[in-house]
UniProtKB/Swiss-Prot annotation:
Domain of life: Bacteria
NCBIfam families found in the cross-reference section: PRK11194.1 (NF008396), rRNA_mod_RlmN (TIGR00048)
A GO term, aspect molecular function: rRNA binding
Catalytic activity, reaction form: adenosine(2503) in 23S rRNA + 2 reduced [2Fe-2S]-[ferredoxin] + 2 S-adenosyl-L-methionine = 2-methyladenosine(2503) in 23S rRNA + 5'-deoxyadenosine + L-methionine + 2 oxidized [2Fe-2S]-[ferredoxin] + S-adenosyl-L-homocysteine; adenosine(37) in tRNA + 2 reduced [2Fe-2S]-[ferredoxin] + 2 S-adenosyl-L-methionine = 2-methyladenosine(37) in tRNA + 5'-deoxyadenosine + L-methionine + 2 oxidized [2Fe-2S]-[ferredoxin] + S-adenosyl-L-homocysteine
Textual note on the cofactor: Binds 1 [4Fe-4S] cluster. The cluster is coordinated with 3 cysteines and an exchangeable S-adenosyl-L-methionine.
The keyword Cytoplasm is assigned to this record: yes
Family: Belongs to the radical SAM superfamily. RlmN family.
Function, in words: Specifically methylates position 2 of adenine 2503 in 23S rRNA and position 2 of adenine 37 in tRNAs. m2A2503 modification seems to play a crucial role in the proofreading step occurring at the peptidyl transferase center and thus would serve to optimize ribosomal fidelity.
Organism listed in the record: Aliivibrio fischeri (strain MJ11) (Vibrio fischeri)
This protein's name: Dual-specificity RNA methyltransferase RlmN
InterPro entries in the record: Aldolase_TIM, Methyltransferase_A, RlmN_N, RNA_MTrfase_RlmN, rRNA_lsu_MTrfase_RlmN/Cfr, rSAM
Length: 372
């Protein structure tokens, strides 16, 4: 029986040094050399690591591998946005590349599917399958950098910002999220500034409290409603941790953080005639008066089967102006990639649907026809 090789992308620097010492009998600086090859040069071939002696390279080839998710499908938008379905094991997750001048943001997934059942989210329709490993989280960045082109080839960083806003709830995968964030920030890893790495949460207070004082990155919170009654209707997690508990944990985190510069980004998806009238805007302004915040309004991205609609431009504009009357900094998220499957999780949902239909065909069974 062949022993599975150890994927070195699963280790942060501390873990990699321990592995080299305890399993390979090597000094810490050797681990550092290999880490630099993996992340600075996008190298997954031990034989190319020309400052590593041959004996160690042979050890590494026998026991280890550097294996990132691979692209199973890609959609390219006319505005430069790329949405990838990345294969993790026998499943897919979504990773989205969003270029904007000198800035290039990568939206990264943390889970296969999601357990939170937010009513407006395409990913929620797929249910929850499993947490991603460290290698599957950082591997999305590694693979995207390879797809876009390494810094040494293009003269510029392929990715300047990472947002943990893809499929899944990051704070329900704390065991793998923390070392993945460490790799993103590490000078031998992706060497990103802590202000250029953002974790978004729908309100997992226990996870946010674990992060407090342990890892310092930018924080974004998915609020989406100004009252517990409405939030519980569209985000069932609110029944576990209500708005007051959530915002209290947010204040604790930003008080311990330098990356957030004293305030949090509040994400608020605008659903037509659900959470987007002027009373909602005023309630939101009052709700956040004790929580220093900038507010990012997100016009809803429709997806097949969704019961919600995007508000009119006039409703979006009125909502924004009402908040600005309370002296909040308010932005409206720019629509990107609207000529491809724009809603988070939609591409993978399509991949899953096609896979199921192919299996049914192969089994010779009838294929159900969707009615409109």
């Amino acid at each position: 029986m062949t022993t599975a090789k150890i994927n070195l992308l699963d280790f942060d620097r501390k873990g990699l040094r321990a592995f080299f010492s305890e399993e390979l009998g090597e000094k810490a600086f050797r681990a550092d050399q290999v880490m630099k090859w993996m992340y600075h040069f996008g190298c997954d071939d031990f034989d190319q690591m020309n400052n590593i002696n041959k004996k160690l390279r042979e050890k590494l080839k026998n026991k280890c591998e550097i294996r990132a998710p691979y692209v199973s499908e890609a959609q390219h938008s006319s505005d430069g946005t790329i949405k990838w379905a990345m294969k993790v094991g026998d499943q897919d997750v979504e990773t989205v590349y969003i270029p904007d001048g000198d800035r290039a943001t990568l939206c990264v997934s943390s889970q296969v599917g999601c357990a939170l059942e937010c009513k407006f989210c395409s990913t929620a329709q797929q249910g929850f399958n499993r947490n991603l490993k460290v290698s599957e989280i950082v591997g999305q960045i590694w693979r995207a950098a390879r797809e876009i082109g390494l810094e040494k080839e293009t003269g510029r960083r392929p990715i300047t910002n990472v947002v943990m806003m893809g499929m899944g709830e990051p704070l329900l995968n704390m065991k793998n999220l923390i070392p993945a964030l460490e790799i993103m920030l590490d000078d031998l890893g992706f060497a990103l500034s802590k202000r250029r790495v953002t974790v978004s949460t729908s309100g997992v207070v226990s996870g946010l409290d674990q992060m407090t004082g342990k890892i310092d990155v930018a924080l974004a919170i998915s609020l989406h409603a100004p009252t517990d009654e409405l939030r519980s209707q569209i985000m069932p997690i609110n029944d576990r941790w209500d708005i007051d508990a959530f915002l209290a944990s947010v204040r604790r985190y930003i008080a311990s953080s330098n990356a957030n510069r004293g305030r949090v980004t509040v994400e608020y998806v605008l659903l037509d005639h659900v959470n987007d009238d002027m009373d909602h805007a005023r309630q939101l302004a009052e709700l956040l008066k004790d929580t220093p915040a900038k507010i990012n309004l997100i016009p809803f991205n429709p997806y097949p089967g969704s019961p919600y609609k995007k508000p009119s431009n006039s409703r979006i504009d009125r909502f924004m102006k009402t908040l600005m009357e309370y002296d909040y900094t308010v932005t409206i998220r720019k629509t990107r990639g609207d000529d491809i499957d724009a809603a988070c999780g939609q591409l993978v949902g399509d991949v899953i649907d096609r896979t199921k239909r192919t299996k049914v065909k192969q089994q010779g069974e009838a294929i159900p026809v969707k009615t409109v």
